[in-house]
């Protein structure tokens, strides 16, 4: 075989091997939507509202991008969840929540008839970072003590 044919063979082989390896890196087994990565639910216990965010095992939420407001002011709440400090490609060193985070809002009666705004942002395995996600929590009136979760 001539030297030129060998070089061409090597180049073509390298191209196919490389393209196969790259396709596995770029195309992960499963890209999840934000709704698949983060499932929000509400639970009222007496005068307390618990906002649960179930986080897919491959996803996480940034602590500094998690908030609850009444539209104007930040609402203070307790938080329950597994957190850790990571370094990722999007925000560098950050405190994140994994698996499940629960926002505990005491004295929920003072918010009757109001709409609260839950906002959060997270990523999927350092592959994609979701844009900020916001959900309205509509607190029922005095005679209608229901809670509704609405996507924005």
Language-model-detected regions and their locations in the chain:
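Extracellular/lumen-exposed scaffold segments
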Residues: 2-3, 7-8, 19-152
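Hydrophobic core
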Residues: 14-17
């Amino acid at each position: 075989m001539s030297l030129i044919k060998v070089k061409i063979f090597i180049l073509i082989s390298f191209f196919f091997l490389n393209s196969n390896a790259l396709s596995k890196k770029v195309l992960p087994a499963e890209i999840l939507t934000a709704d698949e990565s983060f499932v929000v639910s509400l639970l009222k216990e007496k005068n307390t509202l618990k906002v649960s965010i179930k986080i897919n095992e491959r996803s996480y939420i940034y602590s500094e991008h998690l908030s609850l407001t009444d539209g104007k002011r930040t609402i203070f709440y307790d938080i329950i969840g597994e957190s850790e400090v990571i370094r990722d490609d999007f925000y560098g060193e950050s405190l994140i929540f994994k698996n499940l985070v629960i926002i505990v809002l005491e004295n929920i009666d003072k918010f009757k008839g109001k709409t609260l705004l839950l906002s959060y942002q997270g990523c999927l395995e350092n592959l994609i970072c979701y844009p900020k996600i916001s959900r309205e929590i509509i607190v029922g009136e005095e005679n209608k003590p229901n809670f509704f979760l609405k996507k924005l």
